[in-house]
């Protein structure tokens, strides 16, 4: 069973508010939630919302920051022992795609809002940007350095598209993840047979986050 989303390390009412907000934002697709609806979804009183959220109108941004921070920590912890930057890039994309299948509110939130909230884009682009640069520098990827931004954009777009396909039920996460990873590896210049082997390796469980302070960003 997938680990439940933990968007706030303090736990308690604030974590329940974030979890309920994530679900409502994912379902409705809007940028604001009525406090009464949020209180009902979280199973708490309206006053508890105001006691824990200073500006409810900014809740979408708060949830995006928390989600981004949590997934960054967990993907980094999962791939701590990985030394091949190509495999790290491929595995990172597959972790996002699998989680979209296992936690569909989380996946819908990312699909809906990743294009408009920079902090969500950071969660998807920051680790693979490092991996792609390292792969190009070491010769693992056979592309010119000036093409790194294009490959990174391909990765972000393909991952979101695969997540959406999985949520809609068009593909299994295994197929969507391995096919996306294989094509991204081939775009980087990895030979086809090797790209397929890497993309079809057993995917490790997503590690639990070891929370660390992180500077809050607004989008």
PLM features per residue range, with description:
Residues 95-118, 125, 129-136, 196-203:
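Amphipathic alpha-helical segments used for helix-helix packing
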Residues 30-31, 54, 141-142, 171:
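Conserved hydrophobic residue
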Residues 72, 91, 114-160, 164, ...:
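Amphipathic alpha-helical packing segments from all-alpha helical-bundle domains
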